[in-house]
Amino acid sequence: MNSASVWISSLAVAAAGGWFAATMFAAAATGKEPRFPQLTMDQLDEKQKPLGEQVMKVSSVGLAGPYNPMLRSPVLGQRLFDLFHYLRWETSVPTKLNEFAILIIGRQWRSQVEWYAHAPLAAKAGLSPDIIAELKASKRPSGMADDEALVYDFVTELTTTQKVSDETYARAKKVFSDQQIVDLTAVAGNYVMVAMMLAMAEETTPPGKEPPFKVGEK
């Protein structure tokens, strides 16, 4: 097993354990009080509880990650949860490519939680450990299949140049349906928002787990 495979395997094991106390870890590690102390189900009020119950049915992180700040605005949180649900479990984009798009956004934002949560999911969906490792190193991954290269170019162009070139769009039309192109665009935009939410709230990785990206890493 190569080093990339070992790294992905360790992430998968860590993700399976979840991290309900992630925000508490942030306070201990930095000496700062968390911006949003971690909520538990018994702390939720009548407006928050329905959302919390839905989150707990599907979330590998409990009420942590983006859900912790989202619960502070439960009406918005419910609408975001419904969007997340579609973009994770009902999207027309194949799971491997969907998770690849999420990782591209996670790497651009150096989003510790986003990468920590989704790298194992991408690997489980069949994305090569080498592709994941090269993306993490901020390289254009080598050895990508045509559809993977298209997702990389489409998402990267859209988020860094604020447009999709005619050439890349023509490639997309050969590989994806109109619905898939729209869904791919939506998942990229959604996970920019998730990265923003995580950054604003200073949500972090699980207790005792090294963040994927070092401080100051570009």
Regions found by a protein language model. Give the residues of each.
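Hydrophobic alpha-helical segments
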Residues: 20-218
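Bacterial N-terminal signal peptides that target proteins for export
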Residues: 1-15
